[in-house]
Design a protein with these regions (language model features):
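Catalytic cores of phosphodiester-bond hydrolases, prominently lipid phosphodiesterases
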Residues: 2-336
Length: 337
């Protein structure tokens, strides 16, 4: 066999090996792919030109920290993924008869984000809570409802009051929240916060800034190494508020660069805000286009937060079940399903 024939054979073999590297649900995280069906459970096929060429399998689901470890700790000892302006769904028409004056910054409907009238969205939340009796949903409202008891009425009409977490059980002086297991057992699985102070007294709806601190949202909150508090919030290191919310999204959402934002830069900001919050890890992390990333994305950021909160490890999968101290299993095999 001459040299040319050998090179042709070698080239053909290499092409065949690469083309057949994985398919039919066998492709792992960051493996090249051509369709969602190529990727393992918990992954999907996505292109992020800013970080890699072609398409690769990236994460599409969160880790259920309650199932992986336990739900026996206070609510503020866990972290949760938060979708910024969850109603602003690409391709979703307005249901109010007037155009929606906002940027779209999510691609999945509310049901997918959890598993335009307010009633439609709230009914989706009710359906989710009904179908998932061990799950907890937190709603943080930028509240523009002016009608007296208008917000209470829409939650009542959506059938959500049976899940309502009562105001009297919310700690105001930095104490721990009730145990998640107790919240589930008592079916108090819906936490609602409003941005209007008076509604805490008039409607029994928690005023957000009495219970949590929050960093600045938009471009002002995305400068590396700096985590300023939102204007309405107490300073991030105010320990009389036992919940911490970290925003990481630009003022104007741009989905083509969201995959870069929702990756290493996001995790770096969580570490920065940890210091700014008096060495407290975030309980909520809010992003745009939450499924877009260059690999683990917002889901890996959440695994990092829960690892830090629950056992001091860099990944929740490294936590030794039953331990609440620095007991890390560094030989981890992550199942993203």
């Amino acid at each position: 066999m001459d040299l040319r024939a050998s090179l042709v054979l070698i080239t053909s073999y290499l092409f065949f090996s690469v083309a057949k590297a994985c398919s039919n649900g066998d492709c792992k995280l960051l493996d090249p792919c051509s369709s969602n069906g190529d990727c393992q459970a918990g992954l999907y096929c996505f292109s992020c030109p800013l970080e890699f060429s072609g398409s690769r399998c990236v994460r599409s689901t969160t880790t259920n920290q309650f199932k992986l470890l336990n739900n026996t700790l206070p609510f503020n000892k866990y972290a949760f993924l938060t979708t910024h302006n969850a109603y602003a769904i690409e391709g979703e028409p307005s249901h109010t008869g007037v155009p929606r004056v906002t940027f779209t910054n999510q691609e999945d409907n509310v049901t997918r984000q959890l598993n335009e009238p307010a009633i439609d969205t709230l009914k989706e939340i009710e359906a989710f809570l009904s179908a998932n009796p061990t799950e907890i949903v937190t709603v943080i409202l930028e509240d523009y409802v002016q009608a007296p008891n208008g917000l209470t009425k829409v939650f009542t009409d959506a059938g959500l009051m049976k899940y309502w977490f009562p105001l009297k059980n919310m700690p105001k002086n930095g104490q721990d929240w009730p145990l998640v297991s107790d919240m589930v057992a008592n079916n108090q699985r819906l936490l609602v916060f409003t941005s209007i102070r008076s509604k805490e007294e008039s409607e029994g709806i928690a005023y957000q800034w009495n219970y949590m601190v929050e960093n600045r949202y938009g471009d002002g909150g995305m400068h590396a190494g700096n985590c300023p508090n939102r204007a309405e919030s107490s300073p991030l290191n105010d320990r009389t508020k036992s919940l911490v919310l970290v925003n990481y999204f630009p003022t104007i959402p741009f989905k083509q660069i969201a995959c870069e934002h929702n990756s290493a830069n996001l995790i770096n900001m969580l570490h920065t805000c940890f210091g700014a919050a008096g060495n407290r890890w975030a309980n909520f992390v809010a992003v745009d286009f939450y499924k877009r990333s260059d690999g683990g994305g917002a889901f890996q950021a959440l695994d990092t937060l829960n690892g830090k909160l629950l056992c001091g490890c860099d990944d929740v999968h490294a936590c030794v079940n039953g331990s609440t101290s620095l007991a890390c299993n560094n030989d981890i095999n992550v199942d993203h399903s």
